[in-house]
Each structure stands twice: as structure tokens, then as C-alpha cells.
Amino acid sequence: MRPASSFILLLLGLAMVPPVGCSSAPRTLADAGAPLETATNAYRAYEQGDCSQVEATAGKVSLEAWPATEARSSFLLVEGFCAEHAQDIDRARETYRRLLREGPLSFASDDARERLRVLRLQENDPGYEDWIEGARRRALQGSTDRTPIERTPATYPPLAQVAQIGGYAVVEFGVTPRGDTDAPVIVDSNPPLLFDGTALRAVREWRYASDADGTQSERQAIRMVFEPEEADTPDLEAPVSP
């Protein structure tokens, strides 16, 4: 089961929405198996920017011996993040593709698909990076709020919740005259990449009031703040392959 997230939406240049579920559970793992504990420690190392520890752990463990669970898929995901951080894009792609092959039903597989999509754009679209930089500048300038009708909550990444890791993602996106969101992109996030995918998937489902006279802003920017809350621990040891 994918747990609902606790998050705050900050409209850039506008009022802050009050926090939701700010309490944090202690960083403990009761009855954790070795794969889950190893994956959780890797996420905590990544939170601190320590990809060397993630990569050292990856070199020591035998993932083939791990069951095909969310913990295993999430470990592969953070390996891919670190490969991107090291600018080893070929290794990142292969890691994400392996995740899709071996854990196609996992939450982490959705994030892997998002990263592969972005990597394809970076490789094939010469104007992509300039477009992202333009979106970043627009986000910093703020935006006139369109009236929201439906905001689907972002889902908290399961292993990040277990590891009690918080963070944020800033999403810049268009809103069509009829109120659909269009082409959301991440312009800032911390820890890098960790909440990007879930933030994008949520914003794609959002709906705004229509703008029949065309007087409202076509671009919006929202900062999603993710705060781990005391909730049922997600099942990271359930099978994630058919």
C-alpha cells in the first residue's frame, strides 16, 4: 500500500498553506530485516550527500540474494540517483532499467521511469536545459495564483518515510485556459531527485478553475514540503514483481 504523504504547499510569492502532520516518528526500525536496514541506511547516507557510502554498500551487498521487494527497488533507485550525481549517465540508465525489469510494480519504479524520461529529454532535446533554466527564473519571480479545484496529494516515497527523511520539491508548470496542468518540471529539490517524481505525478493530476477571459497567469510555481509523519509503516517487504 502506498501511504499518503504529509506535505505543505507553498505558493511562491503568495501565502503559505498551514503545515499538515508535522510530527515525526523516531528513527528506528523494529524487526527490520537486513535488506530493509541496508536500504534505509543508504537513503540516510544519500540524504547527507554521501553517495560514496551508498556506492560502497552497493559494492558489498549481493542484490541478487535480496527478495524482490520495495526495499530492494528503492536501493536500486538511490544507486541510480548517485550515478547521476557522478555524471555517469550510462550507469544511471542501466540501474533504472534494471529496477524496471526486477521491480516493475514498486513505487520506486515510477520514479525510475521519471528519471529515464528526463534523461531522454536531456539527451535528445538541445533546448531542454535552457527551458528548465527559464522555468527556474519564473519560479523565483513568483506567480499569480490560479484558483485550485483539485489538488491530488503527493504520495510519500515509502523508504523515505521509513527513514524519516523530509525535504522539498519546487514544481513549475503551466495551466491551460480550461484548468489542466501542463508540462510540470522540477526546478529545485532537496534531497536532490528524492521527491521529484512523486511531486510531478501529483501536479499532473491537479485541476484549476477555467480562465475564460485569459487574464490569469499561464505559469504557476509551487513548493511542496514533505515532512515524515507518525503513521503506519509502509510494507517494504511485499513482492513488487509479477
Please identify what each model-predicted range represents.
Residues 18-41:
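Bacterial Sec signal peptide processing site at the extreme N-terminus
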Residues 63-71, 100-115, 189-193:
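Short solvent-exposed coil/turn linkers within tandem alpha-helical repeat scaffolds
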Residues 117-161, 200-205, 230-238:
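Acidic, low-complexity proline/glycine/alanine-rich linker and hinge segments
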Residues 165, 176-212:
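A short, well-structured alpha-helical segment
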Residues 163-178, 201, 213-242:
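A beta-hairpin/wing motif
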